[in-house]
Amino acid sequence: MTLFASSVLLAASLLSVPSQARTLFKYERIQLTQEYLDTLPQEDAQLFAFEDKFVAAPNKTATRCRYFPDDGKWPSDKAWTKLGKQLSSVDALIKPVPQAAVCYPGPIQDDVKCKQLTANWTNSYTHISDPTEILSPVYQGLTCQPPTIYNSGNCTLGGYPSYVINAKTVLDIQLGINFARNDGVRLVIKNTGHDFAGKSAGAGSLSLWTHNLKDITFFDKYVDDSGYTGPAIKAGAGVQAFELYKAASDHGVVVVAGEGQTVGVMGGYIQGGGHSPLSSLYGMAADNVLGFEIVTATGEFTTANSTNNQDLFWALRGGGGGTFGVVTSVTVKAYPEMPVTAASWSFDSTKIGKDRFWAGVRAYVDHFIDNVSNSTYSYFTISPNGNDVTFRMQPFFAPNKTLNTASNLLQPHWTTLTRLNIPINPKLTQYKSFYDAWQAEFPLEPQSDVQTAFGSRLFPRSNFESETGRNISFGALKDSVNAGQIIIAFNMAPALARGGNPDNAVNPAWRNSILHAITGRRWDVKSSANDILAARKSFTNGTMQKWRDVTPGSGSYLNEADRLEPNWQQSFWGNKYAKLLGIKRNYDPKDVFWAVNAVGSEGWTVESFDGLPNENGRLCMVNETISTTTSRMRAMEEPTPVMVV
Ligand SMILES: Cc1cc2nc3c(=O)[nH]c(=O)nc-3n(C[C@H](O)[C@H](O)[C@H](O)COP(=O)(O)OP(=O)(O)OC[C@H]3O[C@@H](n4cnc5c(N)ncnc54)[C@H](O)[C@@H]3O)c2cc1C
Ligand SMILES: *[C@@H]1O[C@H](CO)[C@@H](O)[C@H](O)[C@H]1NC(C)=O
Ligand SMILES: *[C@@H]1O[C@H](CO)[C@@H](O)[C@H](O)[C@H]1NC(C)=O
Ligand SMILES: *[C@@H]1O[C@H](CO)[C@@H](O)[C@H](O)[C@H]1NC(C)=O
Ligand SMILES: *[C@@H]1O[C@H](CO)[C@@H](O)[C@H](O)[C@H]1NC(C)=O
Ligand SMILES: *[C@@H]1O[C@H](CO)[C@@H](O)[C@H](O)[C@H]1NC(C)=O
Ligand SMILES: *[C@@H]1O[C@H](CO)[C@@H](O)[C@H](O)[C@H]1NC(C)=O
Ligand SMILES: *[C@@H]1O[C@H](CO)[C@@H](O)[C@H](O)[C@H]1NC(C)=O
Ligand SMILES: *[C@@H]1O[C@H](CO)[C@@H](O)[C@H](O)[C@H]1NC(C)=O
Ligand SMILES: *[C@@H]1O[C@H](CO)[C@@H](O)[C@H](O)[C@H]1NC(C)=O
Ligand SMILES: CC(=O)N[C@H]1CO[C@H](CO)[C@@H](O)[C@@H]1O
């Protein structure tokens, strides 16, 4: 009897592999504790208190706007100094100065430095390594740009934050969140600043800068309760694509991340969904997440994975950055390295004329479905230049395909182009690994300019199934180019062929889409605010409406979208929005985290100084919602008087 029982036990323990214990980076083990707060003078403890332990002074967060420097309610210099002293390193609290201050009258004006900065301005590294700069300066409000690029007259902070915490530990993040929440200060998170809509900036804010959280750990065999057993990588919130791909390659694996070299993988990218050169094979980056470590709005540091905070885990995989908390690290699945073949080619209308040019483009569009069914990803642009138009494939990316197979995929197209008498000089290369292919094929992308608005649309597979559908979709794209707009597009299918897609917050429109197309409208750099608004209106409600009209019920990718996207809740999340909003209300009822067009952001708006859509102003409640929101906040504040003053 006894023998029998123990052998059953043994068999059971062999079958059920124990799941992974919580593995924290060193910087995640340095945390703020209640025990520590209890040792501080009460006045200081109040500044940094956790939400469930202490409630801010009455009415503080119930004012119409977040406090702003010089409004009389902004925390005193003394309070900021106290914050600085509690952080894990002495220089972690930064009072930012825009880089281009060297170009304007003032104490640090320096013509030589200004020239160097101007020469380097469009290089994205110039901005990523800075605590406040963002890659879409239009949404910072265009103050303090190098004058030969955009003369802003003087150098003010504009949409940049008032203070930045260069976060090096979980402690720093907890202190920042608690301080901002308790003192009515707007909070923003900047990782790399790649966000298309300026979500990583904000005037009069305290910014948590996650860029330096760079740790990476590899697991040979990660065991997750969701059923996954296999290689995995845990990476810090500040890890960028070039660093993650290198680390993966060092261990002979690949991970699903973006094409851009400098994008911050574990910040806005993965939380917003994340498309990848591997998406037609492995889905969206968010589909591959096993767990997040996160500091929530209360200041608590916790895990969101398949067994812990499951609702938060669901929301963080596609629900968008800057909304539910500050993620400190993410664990993702990894897959074996594979060979990749990539191709690039281009042609333009100069010698062949527009009709042949468009016939060549059309021959490619006609095969979108066939190509992605072979797990390929292609990245192409169609750019007008005066009377001419250029098509550039850069690159066509065929993961796990040999030169021969990839050549078979493309040869029919090249034959068609030859038949159309369109000269091309294609380059086809087989790489031994994804890492080599990615490094060689994707150039460093520049910072975006000071006079363009971008928008995007997901085009469903069904649009390309019939000739009528292809005519209509192709017509809409062609019309935009003929109207002078560039198209930057991706042919991919991030629907998992094998095993189905995990249930998460990724925009359902991605699942049946095979084209993600981005376009932009430029305006004259000297345009008045009114002219810019008019140009934007005709872009958002004119051109982009034509794309919406041919893709009814679909949506747009929130990470590469128009800041003025109408009906963004449906567009970015479709039928998942209601559930996301419920999770937001539950984890962040006081809107400690706010970003434009983020889940639950409806009640607030940035009142910019120039009336343009940007971060250059106070964050205030939308007037109609004040009374209800305020009473909701008061109701929440009342029942928790823990400390007696
Ligand atoms: C050149 C370029 C190439 C790109 N390539 C791709 C691509 O291949 N695939 C793709 O899907 N997208 C791509 N994007 C879009 C990209 O996904 C978004 O710009 C994304 O927001 C970048 O995230 P980030 O953290 O680097 O940027 P940031 O601008 O720093 O942050 C973006 C948002 O996430 C929030 N956030 C950042 N870190 C955290 C955190 N730790 N916790 C919580 N919230 C956080 C910020 O507050 C902000 O709201 C590209 C963008 C650019 C400019
Ligand atoms: C708090 O708000 C209530 C209602 O608006 C007001 O009557 C009260 O005077 C405020 N208290 C403080 C300290 O501002
Ligand atoms: C760009 O910046 C680098 C330092 O990051 C500097 O060495 C270089 O001179 C700058 N380039 C130009 C053209 O000034
Ligand atoms: C900066 O210039 C703008 C526009 O000319 C002006 O409105 C603003 O008052 C100036 N700010 C400062 C601090 O001089
Ligand atoms: C999920 O998170 C909890 C809490 O950190 C942890 O105990 C558990 O092991 C995690 N599960 C997996 C599979 O990692
Ligand atoms: C890659 O190709 C090999 C050989 O054709 C195949 O066995 C393997 O399943 C492929 N991997 C993926 C992820 O498709
Ligand atoms: C891929 O697209 C090209 C260009 O349209 C086409 O010629 C080719 O047939 C497609 N591949 C497959 C497998 O259909
Ligand atoms: C598609 O467009 C072509 C060229 O304009 C036209 O000849 C063809 O009849 C159209 N097909 C359908 C089904 O509308
Ligand atoms: C587009 O039209 C809608 C509805 O008329 C309007 O609310 C919105 O402000 C317009 N968008 C822009 C950018 O003008
Ligand atoms: C909201 O109301 C306040 C006064 O209560 C006013 O100053 C502000 O301009 C209004 N904001 C908008 C966007 O109408
Ligand atoms: C290798 C491979 O998957 N080839 C497929 C490419 O797509 C065409 C059309 O869908 C299929 O017929 C091939 O089998």
Name each region found by the language model:
Residues 22-645:
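Soluble FAD-dependent oxygen oxidases
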